[in-house]
Curated annotation (Swiss-Prot):
Residues in coiled coil: 326-418, 444-472, 509-602, 835-923, 977-1116, 1209-1265
Gene Ontology annotations of biological process type: cell division; chromosome condensation; chromosome segregation; DNA replication
Subcellular location: Cytoplasm, Nucleoid
HAMAP family, sorted: MukB
The record's note on its domains: The hinge domain, which separates the large intramolecular coiled coil regions, allows the homodimerization, forming a V-shaped homodimer.
Organism: Salmonella agona (strain SL483)
Gene Ontology molecular function: ATP binding; DNA binding
Protein name listed in UniProt: Chromosome partition protein MukB
Length: 1488
């Protein structure tokens, strides 16, 4: 036996008064005991919330505001929760022993509305050892715990192996899982199902007989018979569809001409607009493509112009930069020319001053010689004067001396004095204070040697003086020359410097002689260097223009290649015009041919459309006119054959219909008259007696009775003998058999059964042999089998007849279509396709246009290449003669070398030019420089000093000699005083003295006169020297200025500078000319770019507008095409012949059709509105909608589902052809589909009986239920009187109301509603339609009335009403009804759920104190018998003997409110055990 699922426990987390509380639920009754406010209702509210987490339903009424018109906003739930995360969880074990924890996470939402957020979830696979509180709480310490959020709970469960956590976004999914796992009894698919479930729980919770339940017990207990209703609805829909089809066929036939006109005009109206939009779209696409091509071309042109602009700007920048450098170079060259000219003028001044200096030098030298001669003469005069003075002085001395030596004594005295004087003089002269006469001899030798040395030195100096005196003037002149050339120098270095200068002068003269050749060579090399630089520039420019770097070795080959290319390009360019002319001529011919084909295309397309229609209709492909005529002959023959076969099939079909009608007679009577005769004779047809014979026995009995199988069995033949007289309305052979119809058997014949046959012995002399018929029709099974086969044959025959009729008509239409085609289109239909030719020619035209564009582009490129090649050849022509220059890599080095040598030579030339004369003058007198010009004076001084030294030495030697000679005189000291005189000697001395004085006077006069002359000569010399120095200084300044100018002032410098300036001027002019050209070209390019930019902007704007228009049109067109394809009207609208009409012609065609359509749809409101909407030119899809609406209208009118073509015109023609056949077929189908009213009544009666039996079975479970005075409870089900009458009429008196059920205008439901109104005219139906009422009457539940009855005391069975029962009795009665509902739900849901699951049963009861102990015991017994769990709440004065009781006490401790819970299991003498699971974190359990 399958165990029923149970609720194990209820867990409340963070509810008001319950932080973490788990209530273990008893298998039967769990009692919550406590005073007011203890938390009983909160606990039950938590259970209900976890069971039905729907905020639209939850409403705990004990919090309802008193006197308010509506309940509290939070419906009593918000106030039962604490802030933060709250949980309510149910721990269950289902029939499969699976533990499932379901629950909800609740959280208060801040705000005035006091809302609560609810999230349902489920946990599967949880081990039994894990308590629910352990899942959702986290212990922080011994006294604190934290509630986990839903995400944290999910993460925690994900870590547990085998545990599945599911969170639900919808209550339906939550309840679906609970139903599948056996937690709830019914699958709650919708909000109404949840509402029923909640109302049941609410009725259980608050007790009593719920009016919401009792008023709608039918919805709770009686299942909906949707299959029967759907069968009726399908039948009615089929009948309605048949009737509508028939009506539509008739209406379509009557509206045939209107529809043809409507189709034709609608097609013209929409197809013209459709093709106009297609043409415009193609034109717009072509325009957009043209715009895009032009845009791309303009972009390419703009890009080319931009590249050109960049190149020209870059070249202009280069030229601007080059112009600056050229201007600087030109200015530098001009300045250089000016400097050269200035230098030349300076050079001329220098040369002029040098000539003046040379002249002054000559005069100065001459004056120097004059001054030197005068000086020499002055020296001689001074010597003569000095000699005269000395002679006078000597004579005076001698005269004095000789005057003293008058006698010997005087002489000796004089000699002694002289000796003393001589000794003193010797001491003084010899600087020998210790000199004595005795040592004088020794000193005499010494001083004589010194005298000899001084004499030799003096002689040497005299020799030098003689030489120096001769070269004195030359030395000064040479020294001045060396100083002039070399600059200031030491006089001692003059000789060496002069020799170096002379040697250098030789080199300088040699170098100066090379100036002109070097200058010519440098000029030549500079010219070659400039040519080389020009060639390099040309090569770089050439490579730049060619876009490739070339080696020098490749230039000649490139030149030949470019010449060959020029030749080939010249030929190509010359032949391009002819080729372009040929292409344009072919293009014009193609255009003319295309125009001709476009005029012929519509006629050919019309012929092809007609030919394609013929091909589609006949399924043949025609390639020539002969095949068309041959096929027309075949059609005529086929038409004749089809007509013959159709007539044969029609005859066979009529025979089958007659046989079916005969076999369909009631009781198996093939003749309807037999039934009337059987009733008349009071008998029964033999076929009706054997109506139940099996299909296997049917052949035997058919053969057994033979022709008498249609006999009538009567009780007594004698009683009908009189009735046979005058009987005319009967078959030709009427068989009558006597027998009891209730116990008739086949013993009336003697029968021998053979193989597949019988022999019937009718009499002794009459036997009948009958074989078993292959198709027996005796008995209902045989007849039905035969009728079924006949029906199948009839279907085949009907289909075949319809096919043949259709084929005949189709053949006839084909014949007419072929005749029209031959008359109108045969001449052009088999010509070549002009559109294919047009496409080919257009492709060729596009190729020609592309070829022309390519040709123009190639021609332009060839011209550009030709020009580039010519420019390249021109550049190469300038480059090739200079290849040797380009290959000369040492030219610049040679120029630098020659420049250096020229600089040296020019420096030498300037040196020679400046100092050549000085060097020429210096060369013959250079030898005089061996003696320093300053040493002449030194030499004179040395000579004078040597002469003085020699004189001194001589005087010293003479003095010493005199001392030595006078050694004897020192002994004449006594004669010193003795004087004597010699008058003669004195007189001679006096005469010589006078002569000497006279000579001295003459010498002095000559000296004075010559000194004046020397002074005059010296003044002239000083003037010349001053003039020379001035000019020399000016010359030096000019030379310094020339050096400062820094240019070579040679003869060709000015010409070279002028040539360089002219070259730079030419380059600058060329550069400026090119720059002006580039500026003009750049301006033109910028203007062209601006024009292209404006054009590009306009093109982009036009292109974007056109593209936007194309895209918009494409979107609309896509919508149109999608609508066209979805509705299958593309073939009708895409008429290719209209593509060759202009937009005005198509618009005119559409307007004409529109005018005709307005008249055609004037009476049809829908089509008129759609047509009015379709007139919007901006919404072409509305025309398609109109066209679709027209065809939809036609389909609705002509029933497209039963014809064999999608062409409305053909459909109308086929409808006319097959109208009678379809009418007959649909009528018979309606008769087969139509269900009899008696069958409907039987179905409803059987359903009612089945449900009454089920309710009776449910009542058996409530027989022993008693509450107070209520001894028993039952559910009474009765059929309403009005509906019972309806059932009776439907089953027995339906013939009286055939006007309702046979009406083609009423469905069966409507006819049923009309019958109900006819039977019950007193009932007001309100605003409900007959269809709605009829559908309600087809639901058996509306036939039943259900009410709850109780057997109470002496009153017997009474209707259970709250007013007639006490509170406890009402509670018990309501609980019984709810148990019945739950059990009914389980029975109903058993087929939807697994057979191995028995769902949990649990109900609530609040305030159970109103029940007495007997009633509570009854509840316990009911729970035990029905395996139901019950949760009841009661104050402290109720103590059930069974189940589990929780004592709840709400306490406040330190401003914290909590509920103290103690769990007890039953009452017994021993101490009850404390229930597991009641220990919590906030409140300990207590046992009592």
């Amino acid at each position: 036996m399958i165990e029923r699922g149970k609720f194990r426990s209820l867990t409340l987390i963070n509810w008001n008064g319950f932080f973490a509380r788990t209530f273990d639920l008893d298998e039967l009754v769990t009692t919550l005991s406590g005073g007011n406010g203890a938390g009983k209702s909160t606990t039950m509210a938590a259970f209900v919330t976890a069971l039905i987490p729907d905020l639209t339903l939850l409403h705990f009424r004990n919090t309802t505001e008193a006197g308010a018109t509506s309940g509290s906003r939070d419906k009593g739930l918000h106030g039962k929760l604490k802030a933060g995360v709250c949980y309510s969880m149910l721990d269950t074990i289902n029939s499969r022993h699976q533990r499932v924890v379901v629950g909800v996470r609740l959280q208060q939402v801040a705000g005035r509305d006091r809302k609560v957020d609810i999230k349902p979830f489920a946990i599967q696979g949880l081990p039994m050892s894990v308590q629910p509180t352990q899942l959702v709480t986290e212990t922080l310490n011994e006294r604190q715990a934290r509630v986990l959020s839903l995400a944290e709970l999910k993460d925690k469960l994900d870590e547990m192996e085998g545990v599945q956590f599911k969170q639900f976004n919808s209550i339906t999914d939550y309840h679906s899982l609970m139903f599948d796992l056996g937690i709830i009894a019914r699958r709650l698919r919708s909000a109404s199902d949840r509402s029923k479930f909640y109302r049941l729980i609410e009725a259980s919770l608050y007790g009593g007989i719920s009016s919401a339940i009792t008023r709608s017990l039918r919805d709770y207990l009686l299942p909906e018979n949707s299959g029967v209703r759907k069968a009726f609805q399908d039948m009615e829909a089929a009948l309605r569809e048949n009737r509508l089809t028939l009506e539509a066929i008739r209406v379509t036939q009557s509206d045939r001409d209107l529809f043809k006109h409507l189709i034709s005009e609608a097609t013209d109206y929409v197809a013209a607009d459709y093709m106009r939009h297609a043409n415009e779209r193609r034109v717009h696409l072509d325009q957009a493509l043209a715009f895009r091509r032009e845009l791309y071309t303009s972009r390419k042109q703009l890009a080319a112009e931009q590249y050109k602009h960049v190149d020209m700007a870059r070249e202009l920048g280069e030229h601007n930069g080059a112009e600056g450098s050229l201007e600087a170079d030109y200015q530098a060259a001009s300045d250089h020319l000016n400097l050269v000219q200035t230098a030349l003028r300076q050079q001329e001044k220098i040369e002029r001053y040098e000539a003046d200096l040379e002249e002054l030098q000559i005069r100065l030298e001459e004056q120097n010689e004059v001054v030197a001669e005068a000086a020499e003469m002055q020296d001689e005069n001074e010597a003569r004067a000095e000699a005269a003075e000395l002679e006078v002085d000597e004579l005076k001395s001698q005269l004095a001396d000789y005057q003293q030596a008058l006698d010997v004594q005087q002489t000796r005295a004089i000699q002694y004095n002289q000796a003393i004087s001589a000794l003193a003089r010797a001491k003084e002269l010899c600087h020998l204070p210790d000199l004595t006469p005795e040592s004088a001899a020794e000193w005499l030798d010494t001083f004589q040697a010194k005298e000899q040395e001084a004499t030799e030195k003096l002689l040497s100096l005299e020799q030098k003086m003689s030489v120096a005196q001769t070269a004195h003037s030359q030395f000064e002149q040479a020294y001045q020359l060396v100083a002039a050339i070399n600059g200031p120098l030491a006089r001692s270095e003059a000789w060496d410097v002069a020799r170096e200068l002379l040697r250098d002068g030789v080199n300088q003269r040699h170098l100066a002689e090379q100036v002109q050749p070097l200058r010519m060579r440098l000029s030549e090399l500079e010219q070659r260097l400039r040519e080389q630089q020009e060639a390099e520039r040309l090569l770089a420019e050439f490579c730049k223009r060619q876009g490739k770097n070339f080696d020098i070795d490749e230039l000649e080959a490139l030149h030949q290649e470019l010449e060959a290319r020029i030749a080939s390009l010249s030929d190509s360019v010359s032949s391009a015009s002819e080729q372009r002319m040929a292409l344009r001529q072919e293009q014009e011919q193609l255009q003319s041919r295309i125009q001709h084909l476009m005029r012929r295309a519509p006629v050919w397309l019309a012929a092809q459309n007609s030919l394609n229609q013929l091909s589609e209709q006949c399924g043949e492909e025609f390639t020539s006119s002969q095949e068309v005529t041959e096929y027309l002959q075949q059609l005529l023959e086929r038409e004749r054959e089809a007509i013959v076969e159709r007539d044969e099939v029609g005859a066979r079909k009529n025979a089958v219909d007659e046989e079916i009608e005969r076999l369909s007679q009631p009781g198996g009577a093939e003749d309807q008259r037999l039934n009337a005769l059987a009733e008349r004779f009071g008998g029964v047809l033999l076929s009706e007696i054997y109506d139940d014979v099996s299909l296997e026995d049917a052949p035997y009995f058919s053969a057994l009775y033979g022709p008498s199988r249609h006999a009538i069995v009567v009780p007594d033949l004698s009683q009908i003998a009189e009735q046979l007289e005058g009987l005319t309305d009967c078959p030709e052979d009427l068989y009558l058999i006597e027998g009891d119809p209730q116990s008739f058997d086949d013993s009336v014949f003697s029968v021998d059964e053979l193989e597949k046959a019988v022999v019937v012995k009718i009499a002794d002399r009459q036997w009948r042999y009958s074989r078993f018929p292959s198709l027996p029709i005796f008995g209902r099974a045989a007849r039905e089998n035969r009728i079924e086969s006949l029906h199948a044959e009839r279907e085949v025959l009907s289909e075949r007849f319809a096919t043949l009729s259709f084929d005949v008509q189709k053949t006839q239409r084909l014949h007419q279509a072929f005749s029209r085609f031959i008359g109108s289109h045969l001449s052009v239909a088999f010509e070549d396709d002009p559109e294919a030719e047009i496409r080919r020619l257009n492709g060729r035209r596009v190729e020609l246009e592309r070829a022309l564009a390519t040709h123009e582009n190639d021609n332009q490129q060839q011209r550009l290449q030709f020009e580039q090649a010519k420019e390249g050849v021109s550049a190469l022509n300038r480059l090739l003669p200079r290849l040797n220059l380009l290959a000369d890599e040492t030219l610049a080095d040679r120029v630098d070398e020659i420049q250096e040598r020229l600089d040296e030579a020019q420096e030498a030339a300037r040196f020679v030019q400046q100092y050549g004369n000085q060097l020429a003058k210096l060369e013959p007198v250079v030898s005089v420089l061996q003696s320093d010009p300053e040493q002449f004076e030194q030499l004179k001084e040395d000579y004078a000093w040597s002469q003085q030294m020699q004189r001194d030495a001589r005087q010293q030697a003479f003095a010493l000699a005199e001392v030595v000679e006078r050694r004897a005189h020192f002994s004449y000291s006594d004669s010193a005083e003795m004087l004597s005189g010699n008058s003669d000697l004195n007189e001679k001395l006096r005469q010589r003295l006078e002569q000497a004085e006279a000579e001295r006077t003459r010498a002095r006069e000559a000296l004075r006169s010559h000194a004046a002359q020397l002074s005059q000569y010296s003044q002239v010399l000083a003037s010349l020297k001053s003039s020379y120095d001035t000019k020399k200084e000016l010359l030096n300044d000019l030379q310094r200025e020339l050096q400062d100018i820094g240019v070579r002032a040679d003869s060709g410098a000015e010409e070279r500078a002028r040539q360089r300036r002219d070259e730079l001027h030419a380059q600058l002019s060329n550069n400026r000319s090119r720059r002006n050209q580039l500026e003009k070209a750049l301006t033109f390019c910028e203007a062209e770019m601006e024009n292209l930019t404006r054009k590009l902007r306009k093109l982009e704007r036009d292109y974007h507008e056109m593209r936007e228009q194309v895209v918009t049109a494409k979107a609309g067109w896509c919508a149109v095409m999608r609508m066209v394809k979805d509705n299958g009207v593309e073939r009708r609208l895409h008429r290719r012949e209209l593509a060759y009409l202009s937009a005005d012609e198509l618009r005119s065609m559409s307007d004409k059709a529109l005018g005709a359509l307005r008249l055609a749809v004037a009476d049809n409101e829908h089509l008129r509105d759609v047509l009015r909407l379709s007139e919007d030119p901006k919404r072409p899809e509305r025309k398609i909608q109109f066209f679709v609406a027209v065809y939809q209208h036609l389909r609705e009118r002509i029933r497209q589902d039963i014809i064999r073509t999608d062409d409305p015109v053909e459909a109308i023609e086929q409808m006319e052809i097959e109208l009678s056949r379809l009418t007959e077929e649909l009528t018979s189908r309606e008769q087969k589909l139509a269900i009899s009213s008696r069958s409907v009544a039987n179905i409803i009666r059987k359903t009612i009986q089945r449900e009454q039996n089920r309710i009776r079975m449910l009542n058996q479970g409530l027989q022993s239920v008693s509450f107070g005075q209520v001894n028993s409870v039952r559910l009474n089900v009765n059929v309403r009187e009005t509906h019972a009458t309806l059932l009776d009429v439907l089953s027995e008196q339906q013939e009286q109301h055939q006007d309702l059920f046979n009406s083609n205008r009423l469905t069966f439901s409507e006819a049923l509603a009309k019958l109900y109104q006819r039977l019950n005219p007193q009932i007001d139906m309100g605003q409900r339609t007959p269809q709605t009422i009829g559908e309600e009457l087809l639901d058996y539940r509306n036939y039943l009335e259900m009410e709850v009855e109780v057997n109470r005391g002496s009153d017997g069975w009474l209707r259970a009403e709250s007013g007639a029962l006490s509170t406890g009795e009402a509670i018990g009665t309501g609980m019984s009804i709810l148990v019945m509902v739950v059990q009914s739900w389980e029975d109903e849901a058993r087929r939807l759920r697994g057979k191995d699951i028995s769902p949990c049963r649990l109900l609530f009861l609040d305030e159970a104190a109103r029940l007495d102990a007997r009633s509570i015991a009854t509840l316990f017994e009911l729970c035990e018998r029905l395996q139901m769990q019950l949760i009841i709440a009661a104050p402290e004065n109720i103590s059930p003997e069974k189940g589990t009781t929780y004592k709840l006490v709400r306490k406040v401790f330190q401003n914290t409110e909590h509920v103290h819970v103690v769990g007890l299991r039953g009452f017994a003498p021993q101490l009850p055990e404390t229930l597991p699971g009641t220990q919590t974190e906030d409140t300990p359990s207590e046992a009592s």
